[in-house]
């Protein structure tokens, strides 16, 4: 089951290793869940519904650490977890290379919080009861809250172990964007102040450090304290997908929260 990571244009698999042809990833399966959610929303096709449910089952049953509920980045064809490597043509591949693959006990805070809100959206579109999925969503949000949020400088880190401080403390634009949506969703679902405080923390960091207000786009990569590392606003792997979506979805959820407290 599941999907391979990298293909050529003729749909033949790329080689393995850094070319990605021998791996399955959380990233691809999460975004296929997102794609099938929208496809099913538009068509109401039973086949699209079935595919969406399959994606949810793969993510929750094969691609998370037990008992933490956090995402595992990469797998072989049989869904055996692998130490994550950086593929040759993905976001961040033009940074200085790392000597080794990431530890197996490593998880990405941005992907976790993003998976939580995309899962909630998928369940809404399927019109299923959210209750059975709440523990999974809460584990993702709680782990990002405990280990991913930088309570000193603001923002959310890149990644770290399941138990312990972050090991990659830079601030990437897309993780900030997904955390805004994810923590607001958690605040709406669980009605806990802690999630609102996480949202405020990340929003303040984004507003004061990451946005180029002159043109409205976000900077790509900052150091932990907000010092600019990459000042470009566009890139092969940096488009307005995360930032525009986060702005729209944040406004939508803030309106929902406002209605709840009236």
What are these regions (language model features)?
Residues 1-262:
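Glycan-recognition and catalytic cores of secretory/periplasmic carbohydrate-active enzymes
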């Amino acid at each position: 089951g599941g999907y391979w990571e990298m293909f050529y244009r003729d749909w033949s698999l790329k080689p393995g290793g850094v070319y990605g042809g021998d791996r399955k990833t959380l990233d691809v399966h999460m975004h296929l869940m997102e794609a099938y959610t929208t496809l099913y929303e538009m068509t109401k096709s039973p086949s699209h519904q079935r595919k969406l449910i399959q994606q949810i089952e793969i993510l929750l049953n094969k691609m998370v650490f037990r008992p933490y509920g956090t995402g595992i980045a990469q797998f072989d064809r049989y869904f055996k977890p692998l130490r994550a490597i950086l593929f040759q043509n993905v976001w961040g591949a033009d940074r200085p290379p790392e000597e080794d693959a990431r530890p197996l006990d490593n998880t990405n805070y941005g992907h976790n919080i993003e998976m939580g809100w995309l899962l909630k959206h998928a369940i809404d579109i399927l019109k299923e009861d959210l209750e059975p999925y709440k523990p999974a969503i809460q584990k993702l949000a709680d782990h990002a809250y405990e280990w991913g949020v930088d309570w000193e400088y603001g923002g959310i880190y890149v990644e770290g172990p399941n138990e312990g401080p972050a090991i990659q403390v830079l601030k990437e634009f897309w993780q900030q964007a997904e955390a805004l949506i994810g923590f607001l969703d958690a605040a709406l679902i669980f009605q806990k102040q802690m999630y609102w405080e996480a949202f405020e923390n990340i929003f303040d960091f984004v507003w004061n450090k990451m946005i180029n207000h002159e043109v409205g786009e976000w900077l790509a990569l900052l150091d932990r304290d907000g010092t600019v590392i990459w000042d470009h606003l566009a890139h092969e792997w940096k488009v307005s997908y995360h930032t525009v979506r986060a702005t729209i979805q944040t406004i939508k959820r803030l309106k929902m929260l406002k209605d709840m407290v009236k």
